């Protein structure tokens, strides 16, 4: 069962598993350009998915992964939400994380559907963390049952090392 603030919600799409190849995506960057997995080829990827970057847990999750992995070799942190790209850019500037990569699934929710994270009732993304190797194989993932909870940061960070 998946909940948001204690209320049961349903997620569109099929949940992924460790060992799966991550589905490609086309997401909107803060400059309105499109980004795909190919744009991050040859790098480890931490895909941090949040319902809205403007909420407390989402803010903390985005800061933590970006700060802790800022010096990690060959690793990129990608935060995904359905916030408009303008809101993501504003948040990055206010947070002092101007180099953070925030991508939006606002256009067609295709990422949310492909990764099993689109909350049907709210048209937001569920909270999750995916760690991908250089070949886009999922080496770690966490789908949170309660969307307002924090992910297991230590486990995700350990999976990157």
UniProtKB/Swiss-Prot annotation:
The Thioredoxin domain, residue ranges: 16-161
Highest taxon above the source species: Bacteria
The protein's enzyme class: oxidoreductase
Disulfide-bond pairs as recorded: 58-92
Gene3D superfamilies hit by this protein: Glutaredoxin (3.40.30.10)
Keywords: Antioxidant, Disulfide bond, Oxidoreductase, Peroxidase, Redox-active center
Catalytic reactions on record: a hydroperoxide + [thioredoxin]-dithiol = an alcohol + [thioredoxin]-disulfide + H2O
Assigned protein family: Belongs to the peroxiredoxin family. Tpx subfamily.
Keyword Disulfide bond applies: yes
Additional remark text: The active site is a conserved redox-active cysteine residue, the peroxidatic cysteine (C(P)), which makes the nucleophilic attack on the peroxide substrate. The peroxide oxidizes the C(P)-SH to cysteine sulfenic acid (C(P)-SOH), which then reacts with another cysteine residue, the resolving cysteine (C(R)), to form a disulfide bridge. The disulfide is subsequently reduced by an appropriate electron donor to complete the catalytic cycle. In this atypical 2-Cys peroxiredoxin, C(R) is present in the same subunit to form an intramolecular disulfide.
A Pfam family per the record: Redoxin
InterPro entries on file: Redoxin (IPR013740), Thioredoxin-like_sf (IPR036249), Thioredoxin_domain (IPR013766), TPX (IPR002065), Tpx_CS (IPR018219), Tpx_Peroxidase_subfamily (IPR050455)
Gene Ontology MF terms: thioredoxin peroxidase activity
Quaternary structure and interacting proteins, as annotated: Homodimer.
Location of the active site: 58
UniProt EC number: 1.11.1.24
Gene: tpx
Protein name: Thiol peroxidase
Functional note: Thiol-specific peroxidase that catalyzes the reduction of hydrogen peroxide and organic hydroperoxides to water and alcohols, respectively. Plays a role in cell protection against oxidative stress by detoxifying peroxides.
UniProt cross-references to PROSITE patterns, sorted A to Z: THIOREDOXIN_2, TPX
């Amino acid at each position: 069962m998946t909940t948001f603030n204690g209320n049961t919600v349903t997620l569109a799409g099929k949940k992924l598993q460790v060992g799966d190849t991550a589905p490609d995506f086309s997401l909107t960057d803060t400059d309105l350009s499109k980004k795909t997995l190919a744009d991050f080829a040859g790098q480890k990827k931490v895909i941090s998915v949040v319902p809205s970057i403007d909420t407390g847990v989402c803010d903390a999750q985005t800061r933590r992964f970006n700060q802790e992995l800022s010096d990690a070799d060959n690793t990129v942190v990608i935060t995904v939400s359905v916030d408009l790209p303008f809101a993501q850019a504003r948040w990055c500037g206010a947070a002092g994380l101007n180099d953070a990569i925030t991508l939006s699934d606002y256009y067609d929710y295709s990422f949310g559907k492909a990764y099993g994270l689109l909350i049907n009732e709210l048209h937001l993304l569920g909270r999750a963390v995916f760690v991908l190797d250089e070949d886009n194989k999922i080496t770690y993932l966490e789908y949170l049952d309660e969307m307002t909870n924090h992910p297991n940061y230590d486990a995700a960070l350990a999976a990157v090392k």
